From Swiss-Prot:
The lineage of its organism: Bacteria, Pseudomonadati, Pseudomonadota, Betaproteobacteria, Neisseriales. The modification N6-(pyridoxal phosphate)lysine is found at residue 229. GO terms for biological process: glycine biosynthetic process from serine; tetrahydrofolate interconversion; tetrahydrofolate metabolic process. (6S)-5,6,7,8-tetrahydrofolate binds at residues 121, 125-127. Keywords: Amino-acid biosynthesis, Cytoplasm, One-carbon metabolism, Pyridoxal phosphate, Transferase. Its EC number is 2.1.2.1. It comes from Neisseria meningitidis serogroup B (strain ATCC BAA-335 / MC58). GO terms for cellular component: cytoplasm; cytosol. Homodimer. Belongs to the SHMT family. Its cofactor is pyridoxal 5'-phosphate. Its main location: cytoplasm. This is Serine hydroxymethyltransferase. The keyword ATP-binding does not apply.
Length: 416
């Protein structure tokens, strides 16, 4: 029998210590990785619940195990809420990740060797959109589009490649593209060649939910998203559709094809996050995320840095470090010493290797969750520039770190 009186610290002090250290790191560092965010205590409560004990293969009302009457309620709440949030007719909340959601979409209507047209990883796309190192690039014949000479998504190239290669599916969405994507234009191109249109909105989903980024659902055959990032939920995935045409194929692609039992504790946490995103205050959050990102980009330009695509229209942007003569890898390390967390990221036509890069990616979602406003964002951008202008000066790093600490103390991750 387990006892509720035995704490993790008592039973496994080594693990408890590592968790405590990570808690402290999150408090003491400003998080600027675009794919990260903080979840609410309610989300964590749901994810840490006894639902983790329950196996529930199948779907609500059609399970392969007994005792699922209450987890059916949990999953249906998540389904209903995410459908309302994005105006979808169909939702599958069982994918363990965005990558698995994407795999399920491909498997539902494609056969190995079919052609897909997706955004190049080198220009801001995602591994799962046909990169050669990913299963999507191994199973399918992947053709890629990219950015034009102004570092704007090249819709003319998308259309030219679509007409040339006649893909069965066109994939839109990105992991490192700052501007708004024209879903209607993609729909127009897809219709010209009779292709399915699939949008991966993982990075933008929270902005879509908050009304600050165009909703792809009305234009697409398939939409996927992660539930973390700008959506502020647990780590996981979702599949959405504007109608129920592919319901049977998608459901069977997830279970039994790609996954077994769903993670009911994570689905419960998703349901909480969807409820939070349906509240009026989430719209203000999404608006502030964009304001903060734009403010940071503006300040960095003033300090002599170049922003890929020239600006941001979302939560994310890439910084070209070549004018500073520093690599992304070195910048990530220097900023980390100053308690500013970013990730190195390739820029379009990057001459450096992927593990080195010539850029960094900056996102405003997590800092905005903490409460950072536009003025704070501008201060933070200048602190980033201070580090990048003198990345090996320990005194400079210590000075910036002290100012970062003051900002972090002003905005604790979890208040009283």
């Amino acid at each position: 029998m387990f006892s509720k009186s035995v704490t993790l610290a008592q039973y496994d002090p080594d693990l408890a210590a590592a968790i405590a250290q990570e808690d402290q790191r999150q408090q003491d560092h400003v998080e600027l990785i675009a794919s990260e965010n903080y979840v609410s205590c309610a989300v964590m409560d749901a994810q840490g619940s006894q639902l983790t004990n329950k196996y529930a293969e199948g779907y609500p009302g059609k399970r392969y195990y007994g005792g699922c009457e209450y987890v059916d309620i949990v999953e249906q709440l998540a389904i209903d809420r995410v459908k309302e949030l994005f105006g979808a007719a169909y939702a599958n909340v069982q994918p363990h990740s965005g990558s698995q959601a994407n795999q399920a979409v491909y498997a539902s209507v494609l056969k190995p060797g079919d052609t897909i047209l997706g955004m190049s990883l080198a220009h801001g796309g995602h591994l799962t959109h046909g990169a050669s190192v990913n299963i999507s690039g191994k199973l399918y014949n992947a053709v890629t589009y990219g950015l034009d000479e102004n570092e704007v998504l090249d819709y003319a190239e998308v259309e030219r490649l679509a007409l040339e290669h006649k893909p069965k599916m066109i994939v839109a969405g990105a992991s490192a593209y700052a501007l708004q994507i024209d879903w209607a234009k993609f729909r127009e191109i897809a219709d010209k060649v009779g292709a399915y249109l699939f949008v991966d909105m993982a990075h933008y989903a929270g902005l879509v939910a908050g009304g600050e980024y165009p909703n792809p659902v009305p234009f697409c055959d398939f939409v996927t998203t992660t539930t973390h990032k700008t959506l502020r939920g647990p780590r996981g995935g979702v599949i959405l559709c504007r109608d129920n045409t592919h319901e049977k194929a998608l459901n069977s692609s997830i279970f039994p094809s790609l996954q077994g039992g769903p993670l009911m504790h994570v689905i419960a946490a998703k349901a909480v996050a969807f409820k939070e995103a349906l509240q009026p205050e989430f719209k203000q959050y999404a608006k502030q995320v964009k304001i903060n990102a734009a403010a940071m980009a503006e300040e960095l330009v003033k300090r002599g840095l170049r922003i890929v695509s020239g600006r941001t229209e979302s939560h994310v942007f890439l910084v070209d470090l070549q004018p500073m003569k520093i690599t992304g890898k070195a910048a990530e390390a220097a900023l980390g010493k100053a308690h500013i967390t970013v990730n190195k990221n390739a820029i379009p036509n990057d001459p450096e290797k992927p593990f080195v890069t010539s850029g960094i990616r900056i996102g405003s979602a997590a800092m905005t969750t903490r409460g950072f406003n536009e003025a704070d964002a501008r201060v933070l951008a200048n602190l980033v520039a201070d580090v990048l202008s003198n990345p090996e000066d320990e005194a400079n790093l210590a000075k910036v770190r002290k100012q970062v600490t003051a900002l972090c103390n002003k905005y604790p991750v979890y208040g009283a």
